[in-house]
Design a protein with these regions (language model features):
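SAM cofactor-binding core of SAM-dependent methyltransferases
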Residues: 2-47, 53-56, 63-64
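Class I S-adenosyl-L-methionine
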Residues: 6, 38, 44-52, 61-211
């Protein structure tokens, strides 16, 4: 089974998937993250990736995040800043690439905020999870949207505001997701979330073999 991580960053998804026996390729435009292939996904040729079974796509969330609401990147549903226009184009290019390689399963991840409002995701299946459900201890809740084609056997785990498993983070506070020191820390996908999805994918692709 072969997997592809677009916008791999910390490569936590690939670490989880490799531990389950999936052969991974990581792609990121930032050379500091040391991906297998350093480039923008806009520059990829779908013909080179026709054997991919599963894709994880993590586009930059900067203009879509709750913390960017006051910056006015969008007005009445229209991207008005150069940053928002570039982000929309980048996400659409990633989705076009995924459709072109047509993997059995794929997921695009972004915090629960403005990406879900963009017109180019309205026809996609969407699930919402809480990151605190996939990490040990008391951690930020970080509600996160997952778009794409996921296995029917996989069940998203969603928490509720005020639950004791995560750090309280009223809007405007500096706890919760806002309390992470860097954007890279905020972007790390929980290992167990990635692993739970991959286990379900493998189970369905192998006719019910349970992990």
């Amino acid at each position: 089974m072969k997997g592809l991580e677009l916008g791999s960053g910390s490569k936590e998804v690939s670490r989880a998937w490799r531990d389950l026996g999936i052969e991974m390729i990581t792609i990121d435009h930032d050379p500091e993250t040391e991906p297998d292939i350093c480039c923008k996904w806009e520059d990829l040729d779908p013909a080179d990736y026709q054997d991919i079974d599963i894709v994880w796509f993590s586009p930059d969330c900067t203009v879509y995040s709750v913390m960017s609401f006051p910056k006015g990147h969008f007005k009445e549903g229209v991207a008005v800043s150069d940053e928002a226009k570039a982000s929309d184009a980048s996400v659409e290019a990633g989705l076009d690439f995924i459709r072109a390689i047509d993997p059995g399963f794929w997921v695009m991840e972004n915090p629960r905020a403005l990406l879900r409002k963009r017109p180019f995701v309205q026809d996609l299946d969407r699930y919402t999870v809480s990151y605190c459900q996939y990490r040990a201890g008391i951690t930020p809740m970080k509600p996160t949207d997952l778009f794409g084609v996921l296995p029917v056997s996989w069940e998203p785990q969603m928490c509720r505001n005020g639950a004791p498993c995560h750090i309280p983070a009223p809007r405007g506070s500096y706890t919760g997701t806002q309390g992470f020191q860097t954007a890279k820390e905020r972007a790390v996908v929980p290992y167990e979330l990635a692993a739970s999805i991959a286990r379900s994918c493998i189970t369905e692709m192998h006719g019910g073999w349970q992990f």
